[in-house]
Structure formats: C-alpha cells, structure tokens
C-alpha cells in the first residue's frame, strides 16, 4: 500500500503479511516505484521468522528512508536511511536500555535522524547484596 502526501512531496509505502510469520524475506515487487521526491518505507520484521533481511537488501529497494519495526530495542548505531526506533516503552524485563522514538528529516535526498528518549519507565539490572539479617524495609531503602 502506498499513501501520497503531495503537500510534503512524500509518499509512504508499507507491506503487510497475512500470516503470523513470514520467513521468506524481502520481495522484489516491493522495490520503490518513485512518485514523489521523498519515498519512505515502513517495514516490520528482521528476525529469522518475521521477514528476515539485512541492511543491504533494504538499501537495494531504493527508498529514501526505511522505518523498521519488530525489534523493541532502538538501534542507536544504525543511522542514515534505515533505522529501528524500538518501542516507546519497555515491554518486558529483557527490554533494558533507552526507549523512545526517531524523528527525522529528508531534504534533497539527505536523511537526518535523531533518537529521542521518551519512556516513562525502565527496567534495570541491579546487584544488591542481601543477607539473613536484611528486612523488607531495608531492602526497599537500598532500592531507592
């Protein structure tokens, strides 16, 4: 599906899958058919069961920017034309680290993105020494 925003000179494309998993990878028919100055792709997947792909495959599709979803942790090292923003909030105790959104601009083919932390809560791994003498109240004091 493609939605055009002529006032912004931008088109946004996305491809959904009908099954719970799509292990087949990126499809040739998803290649960018340019209709606007800026072409953005929304793509969900990236692991072995949910549309496996690599950066090079995404780049070959020819979009100016690809907003990636499925991985809950932001990829802060992946800059430029393709980026996982992660989830706005951690969704389970394994979601350690920053959470937020990506804001960006595309001007004359140049893409700039910035990760903006926005989570109101976070999971932390804490090492706390406890012994037989420690009360619940003392443990709470250490946690603060």
Task: Please provide the spans of the model-predicted regions.
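His/Asp/Glu-rich metal-coordinating catalytic cores
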Residues: 1-83, 87-100, 105
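Binuclear metal-dependent phosphoesterase catalytic core
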Residues: 2-6, 85-144
């Amino acid at each position: 599906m493609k939605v055009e925003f002529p006032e912004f000179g931008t088109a946004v494309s996305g491809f959904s899958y009908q099954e719970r998993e799509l292990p087949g990878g990126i499809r040739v028919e998803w290649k960018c058919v340019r209709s606007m100055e800026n072409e953005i792709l929304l793509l969900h997947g990236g692991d072995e069961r949910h549309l496996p792909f690599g950066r090079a495959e995404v780049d070959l599709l020819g979009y100016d920017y690809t907003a990636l979803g499925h991985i809950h942790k932001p990829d802060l090292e992946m800059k430029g034309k393709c980026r996982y923003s992660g989830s706005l909030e951690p969704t389970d105790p394994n979601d350690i680290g920053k959470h937020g959104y990506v804001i960006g601009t595309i001007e004359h083919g140049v893409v700039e993105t910035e990760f903006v932390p926005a989570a109101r809560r976070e999971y932390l791994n804490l090492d706390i020494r406890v012994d037989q003498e420690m009360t619940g109240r003392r443990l709470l004091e250490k946690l603060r």
